[in-house]
């Protein structure tokens, strides 16, 4: 049996990377939005949610933007794999892939960086207070999954960089 044509292999690789990005972003979203802790400070218990940390709100926004773009690109890629034709005629789809992948990858990495930085900053302040260590660990886990989603999108960005000069 002959190997598939390179164009089909690259289309399938792009589809797999987009699906992996989607999975990592969904996992990051679930971990982040379910992140709560109870702080015990001088006989007072305070319930802390992820939305109380500004950087986690930014992480949430980057995850939602990344998910919206990834779902759109999965639909475009599925159509391309199934039919061999792009949704948009001309070079519009390639340019959209090129610029979209670049912008989204930068958005995702800034969200991950904000998550890591804020988690590192608040860790020494509240360490050992109630179940705050679990809150910290979930923050790191969510930021890590977001970073892995960025890596998948960055690889897709390289693929779209190679595809654009071939068509333009």
Curated annotation (Swiss-Prot):
Residues 33-57, 119-144 are extracellular. It is found in: Cell membrane. It comes from the Eukaryota. Pfam families: CASP_dom. Residues 1-11, 79-97, 166-168 are cytoplasmic. GO terms for cellular component: plasma membrane. InterPro entries: CASP_dom. The chain crosses the membrane at residues 12-32, 58-78, 98-118, 145-165. The keyword Transmembrane helix applies. It is a multi-pass membrane protein. Keywords: Cell membrane, Membrane, Transmembrane, Transmembrane helix. Its main location: membrane. Homodimer and heterodimers. Belongs to the Casparian strip membrane proteins (CASP) family. This is CASP-like protein 4D1. It comes from Ricinus communis (Castor bean).
């Amino acid at each position: 049996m002959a190997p598939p044509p390179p164009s089909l292999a690259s289309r399938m690789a792009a589809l797999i990377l987009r699906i992996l990005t989607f999975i990592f972003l969904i996992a990051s979203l679930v971990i982040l939005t379910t992140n709560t802790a109870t702080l015990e400070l001088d006989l007072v218990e305070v319930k802390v949610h992820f939305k109380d940390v500004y950087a986690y709100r930014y992480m949430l926004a980057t995850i939602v933007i990344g998910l919206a773009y990834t779902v759109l690109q999965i639909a475009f890629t599925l159509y391309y794999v199934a039919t061999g034709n792009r949704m948009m005629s001309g070079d519009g789809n390639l340019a959209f892939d090129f610029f979209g992948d670049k912008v989204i990858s930068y958005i995702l990495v800034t969200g991950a960086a904000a998550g890591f930085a804020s988690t590192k900053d608040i860790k020494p302040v509240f360490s050992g207070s109630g179940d705050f260590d679990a809150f910290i660990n979930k923050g790191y886990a969510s930021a890590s999954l977001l970073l892995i989603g960025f890596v998948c999108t960055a690889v897709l960005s390289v693929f779209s960089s190679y595809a654009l000069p071939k068509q333009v």
